Amino acid sequence: MYIDGVFSGGGVKGIALAGAYEVLEEKGFRFKRVAGTSAGAIIAAFIASGYTSKEIHALIEEVDGEKLLDQRYSFLPLKMLQWVSIYWRLGLYKGDTIEKWIADLLRAKGIRVFGDLQKGSLRLIASDLTNGTMIVLPDDLARYGLNPDMFPVARAVRMSCSIPYFFEPIKLKTDTGTATVVDGGVLSNFPIWLFSKERKRPVIGVTLAPRERERPKKNIRNAFELFGALFETMKDAHDARHIASRYEQNIIFLPVDDVMATDFHLTQQKKLALIELGKRRTELFLKQWTY
């Protein structure tokens, strides 16, 4: 059965998305169109490029997450280097290594630019801080004077997963100036709304967040907790409105509480546990899902 799929962001927690994909594929579901933000952008790009769930599972087992972080070398002490990197480079890590890793894997399937994919089969979300707008890739690239068909898919994925202060933002250079682009999760971490205006088949979403009614209330007692709650609300409120009103029955919820989004040092055991969580939750979802 053909479906469309939407995958949420969540950093390293996104390994659980691979488990969900594995069960969906085993049950005979095939994706015509996929969309995603951040970690969801990575798995969406792999699916659109023809990777099977088993192949993605193998990639997760093989990759050393620590090696995807391009370290900076300096005479400065580590702590000082980190502050300098954030202040001047706007990110602890350049992000070049993870982009190359993605590009190499896509190239192995014959995919380099969006024109190599079936038109409309992949959409990714990024955030343009310079102009204060959300970017839907590749659709909105024309706004920047860029040819969507000739834009590298790996660069678009890198834009979508540029976690603020962790990876350097992407500087999108155009004829009209330079836009600073960061993680799509800043504006829409779970773009389940993307296919609503042109729904052609069932849409299944997979999110790394809990159901709205299961979310813990935020305790705000100081400025740091206020900032955290403010950022979380900005990130999730837009998507939560869509989920609550229309889509919840079509969403697989994979709440991951014991892993940080930026923990690239996961053991094999923890990776497999995340995949198993995705599989288990998806099997439960399919037992009661009707379409």
UniProtKB/Swiss-Prot annotation:
UniProt EC number: 3.1.1.-
GO process terms (BP): lipid catabolic process
Pfam hit, one: Patatin
TM stretches of this protein: 34-50
PNPLA domain location: 5-196
Broad class of enzyme this protein falls into: hydrolase
A cellular component annotation (GO) from this entry: plasma membrane
Its job: Probable lipid hydrolase.
Record protein name field: Uncharacterized protein YqhO
Provenance organism: Bacillus subtilis (strain 168)
